Amino acid sequence: MNERLQYSHLMNYITKHNRKLSKTYTWNDDSQRVSATGFSNQRLRWSNKTSICLILSTLDNKFIACSRKHSFLYSEIVRCRSVFRKKRLFLTYTRFLKKKERPFLSSKLNVPLDDPGTEHNDIIFPGGLPKNEEDPIMCLSREIKEEINIDSKDIYIDSRFFVHLFIEDLLSNRVYETILFLGNTTLTSNEILNNFLANREIKSLVFLDALEKGLMCDVLRYVLAISQLKCFGSTGDKTELLYDKVTESEKKMAPRYGFD
């Protein structure tokens, strides 16, 4: 494992206070390397820099993923302050940008672009960063409603375990941490598509099959395998309505933040 990953305070805490369910598995593609470790959910810790995400299965046995409105590389180039680094990322990794992003950045950076190339899409599982007053369950409920327009009353979550991910962006050389849960919805993929509204983060939905190839499906299969294990010592349950979990979390957080 990359030396930088060994100094994660979050991972050190999780390993100390939660029973590990498997060894760490690592997969990679041209743009990222992902290391996954499953834990029994005994004493979860999180921060507002750690993404909380959900692998969500539909009533017709598909798994929901999201196609980002902007590529990760575009977001990195826009955020970066160094003009030299902006140009280097653009020239070196142009194919990891969306087609419409390439001419825009070419003009913005004053760098010629001869061939717009093929389309590129970054696919993610729904979720995001928790706000200061949120725990992971509250974060999931809000993010899933915002991103894919599914209400917490239509989602059941398996809170017996969670999977910790190290995501190494091989283009920007950044490392991100994610806590991943598993759940299911009472809606079909067609119902979800009909209710979905494109937003500032998500362009469209993608429905995955567990047998497909690719890094996302490697992670998906790992999480499904972990869900078959006995999560001894866990404080969670195999099937809990997300709405009820959120209500429970809000009551626990109320004294801390002074909610009414």
UniProtKB/Swiss-Prot annotation:
Positions of short motif Nudix box: 128-149
Main enzyme class: hydrolase
Binding site for Mn(2+): 147
Residues the record lists as binding Mg(2+): 134, 169
Limits of the Nudix hydrolase domain: 46-230
Keyword line: Hydrolase, Magnesium, Manganese, Metal-binding
Cross-referenced InterPro entries: NUDIX_hydrolase-like_dom_sf, NUDIX_hydrolase_CS, NUDIX_hydrolase_dom, Vaccinia_D10_decapping, Vaccinia_D10_N
Cofactor: Mg(2+); Mn(2+)
Annotated EC: 3.1.3.-
Conditions for induction: Expressed in the late phase of the viral replicative cycle.
Active site annotation, chain numbering: 143 (nucleophile)
Molecular functions (GO terms): metal ion binding; phosphatase activity
Family: Belongs to the Nudix hydrolase family.
The protein's role, per its UniProt record: Decapping enzyme required for the removal of the 5'-end m7GpppN cap tethered to viral and host mRNAs to allow their decay in cells. May therefore accelerate viral and cellular mRNA turnover to eliminate competing host mRNAs and allow stage-specific synthesis of viral proteins. Acceleration of the turnover of cellular transcripts may even promote the shutoff of host protein synthesis.
Listed name of the protein: mRNA-decapping protein D10
Native source organism of the sequence: Rabbit fibroma virus (strain Kasza) (RFV)
